[in-house]
Amino acid sequence: MKKLPIIIAACAAVFGGTLSADTYDTPVAESELIWANVPDALKQAKWIWPTPGSWGYDITNSYAAFRKTFKLDAVPRKATMYITADQSYRLYINGKFVCNGPARGYQRSWPFDEIDVSKYLQKGENLIAARVYNPGRHTFSYVFEGRAGLLFALDMGKAGVVRSDSSVQARRQTGCRRDTAPYSVQMANQEHIDLREENPDWINLGFSQKGWNKGAGTSTGEYNAMPYYMFEERGIPMNGYREIPMKSLVAEGEGASIADSFDVRNAAELVSKEGMKLSKAVGKEMSSITVAPTEKGRQRSYLIDFGKVVVGIPIFKIEGANGGEIIDTVMAEYYKKDFEIDNPYNTGSMRALANRMVCRKGDFTTEFFALQGFRYMLVRVRNNSAELKITPIMRWAAYPLEDNGEFKVSNENAQKIWEASRHTEKVCSLDAFVDTPLREQAQWWGDARVQAWNTFFISGDTRLLRRGIRSIASQQVPNGLTYGHAPTFAHSCILPDFSLTWILTLYDYYWQTGSIEPFVSHKNVVDGIISYFENMKDPRTGLVKYDPRYWLFLDWTGIQKEGQPAILNHWYLQALDKLTQMCRQSNYLVDAKRYENLARSIRASIAKYLIDSEGYAIDGILPDGKSSNLRSIQAQVMAKMNSVEGFDFEKAKNNIVLPYLRGEIKTHAVPSSYWAVYVFKTMVDAGHQKEVYNFILKNWKEMGEYGSTFENYDASKMSHSHAWSAHPAFILPDILSGVKQTGAGWSSVSVNPSTTLEDEYRIVYPTPRGKITVEKKAGQKPTVMIPASINSQN
């Protein structure tokens, strides 16, 4: 039987420590300290959910709508809305969209949002409206705990508090089909909504509330009733919002409509079976489309381009509907011959990024619920007996990443690559660093490390990284490993190497900010990870072995993973080295000595077994106990990163790594566009900026032209919005500026600007101690400006 956390763990969770387990030996001695961070107004609110049944009954793929009216004699100067929902909400006040939330998290310490909504209020009658969704199942960003609900409190000071309770009017949105197909293996379900039943005007004042529940028709629960034992502040800013119109109509066409197209659970499958090729190229900029009447048994299709990958909430303004028209939308990032969009609904991740609406009569504006990322949208219309005007809009909804860093260069290709990288980072920064907004929206931690580096240059913001560190720490395997992404149900996505990456991001945070706090807060998680790896050592070699229970990632390529893989052991060594430094910095001297001894042991094993007689790094010990004869680029790079004794970097560099960068040799394990970041960092540090620069200009050129970075170099069937390959966002500035951080928190730097790679550039680093500016004008030597608080070691 599960027991509640001890008071120490509870307080640690409230004040920023780890919350990594839910079974304890000692019951809680409850104290108000546990809920000290919960605003008093929110403590007075109730969790609410419309009946039938209790607030955990029959909620699979469910939407609910809530309305609360109140009057004001005057608009208060400040009106703080505290709000959360399980799983997610959209908030409107007086018909205007306010925000979406909460951030992903765990019910045992559920996040709530805080927003000043005074600008949305008015004298007289006011309306709070919220739409809430719960998938009723797990996804790659949500762990279902058997409950759904809305909790809010609007604190207006002397004007009073409006809170969620049984006075709120609510109803299940029965016009939303419940048995729709998932968007993908990783995400929730398609939204199919019949607007004849679900009037979008419900968010406005004056709407008739006939048929809405109130009082006995709403289930309620105390704010801290299980599973919501504790709460935490969002810890990151609310999303930034703006409306983006469609940019152009790419193509259009028409065809037969499948006979049973009125009753489908997977709109992506329907569209695919009907055919997605379009016959007429259009290529015109426009903000809306006009659909001619469609004959019975026929459909008309339109391929819309938003100009580049966008992320947010799809909105549709409809004019001239007679009621009953069906509009299916399928989202994609690219199209093929005959304007056929990428729609692999039955392969891989089973990506079926589609929605459906059935129109009501008249003119109206409606919006779908799920945040979605895409560039192209196929709009398929059927059953329209009269002309129909459709205006698609995207409400951008993403982390408000500020442009504090600057990269301007005279090379047009380099500039486009950098801007594509920056844009990719922005569409992959939501309530967490996500791999791609397209098919997953999962907080993969190998990706997140690269994204943090990107963000350090683009904005200098570390809050997404800090929140992500805690999120990963909060979901562990009993043996100490963390999950590859979190929160999640994906037990097949436990990646031992990503647990080591998580440790390295503790160091990254320290190196960027000078703060050791995350390491101190999560040291118990670190100890669990190290315990796992020590238990996985081969007694003969002292090297870490492959564990077939888990997915050992290492790289998206043919690198050795079974036996005793070199790359895994190198990552373990690097983690131990960084832990030793952090322990010394935080005065954990006994632990520092322990980690130092463990590092010394694994370093000796690597030198003995993973460096061959010629001084090259090999890929590992094979399952049969023999040494591999393969010398991957990854192994050479990691041996250099770890300064392994006996490794001949000059030989490996000249015969393997540089020939690869120059395109002179092929290799058995080509570094992916993700893992290339480690190649680039290592070779730039070794003085080979030119080779890295030219490699990026060649291999990222297509990405620069497209406007965002791909999952890998071959864009075919791959995501076109993958931030793990957006590292030119910081690598290109490093190459040209020659800025190298040499002290934690940017306390010191060295600068050696390029004088030959480009004639003109301007680069600005937004460090915690002020901006570093490196600028080169045509025909002149570079100039460098460094804040007085940063020690220049030139």
Question: Whereabouts are the PLM-identified features?
Answer:
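Active-site core of glycosidic bond-cleaving carbohydrate-active enzymes
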Residues: 444-459, 463-794
